Amino acid sequence: VEKYLHHYAEPEILALDGLPDQLSWENVMVIPACNESSGFLRTPPPCDGRSLMILVINESVTAARNVSLRNQALATAVQERFDRLWQAAPGSGLSLWRDPLAARDVLLVDRFTQDRQLPAKGGVGFARKIGADLALSLIHQQRISSTWIHCTDADVSLPQTYFRSSNKLPVTEQKVSALIYPFSHCDVQERAESSEVIEATQLYELSLRYYVAGMKFAHSPYAFHTIGSTMAVNAIHYAKVRGFPKRAAG
């Protein structure tokens, strides 16, 4: 883990050096957000202590103006709803916010303002890696009790058992590298704007399940979903594979 953090982690982890000593959490989740509304800031799934959401608001240098405006609105929503706990050194893009209504803090990562945007070929993988690297650093510092880096997206509705499912695993279990949460595209009928969107969503989910079914039929050891928004990664194994790929998804 130390080798990964020293040689391969993103530079945002260096800004954590000034984090107050008394701050710690039970669980962590990483959310890369681009062009999202603030609806996902609702009450998080419960855990035995406080949870930490690492929110990486991001856009590429080629992003349209409307994307920049939506990202700024999301950052403003965090700053208005939550109480500031800590601000990293100027230019680092990190700040920590406490939810006054839930046992949850938000580590806000700015990768969308001028001079902090992702490169043109950077995408959700890059943003997810930034967040996961920060989570790994905090786990290594023993500020986060769980060794699982939970990864999800802003448009995902999480079950109440989200954190508790991983917390049930033995602390000493190091053979399990990742967890895949079951998923479905919910409320498509109510929220879709047209029958074409409904059909496209259903076909997309069918293709995901068909692929895994085909891999299972072929007796492949890789017969599982690899969707960034539905997984949790063991911190040690995350470091062994040198983190998430930086490329855009798709």
Put a short name on every predicted segment.
Residues 1-52, 56-62:
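N-proximal low-complexity "stem/linker" segments adjacent to membrane-targeting elements
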Residues 5-8, 66-146:
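Active-site-proximal specificity loops/subdomain of glycosyltransferases
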Residues 56, 111, 179-182:
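Short glycine/serine/threonine-enriched helix-capping/active-site loop
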Residues 139-159:
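Short beta-strand-to-loop acidic/aromatic patch adjacent to the donor-nucleotide binding site
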Residues 160-182:
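Conserved donor-nucleotide/metal-binding helix-loop-beta segment in metal-dependent transferases, i.e.
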Residues 175-198:
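Short beta-strand-to-loop element that shapes/binds the nucleotide-sugar donor at the catalytic cleft/hinge
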Residues 212-232:
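A recurrent flexible, glycine/aromatic-enriched loop bordering the glycosyltransferase active site
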Residues 242-250:
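Donor nucleotide-sugar recognition loop
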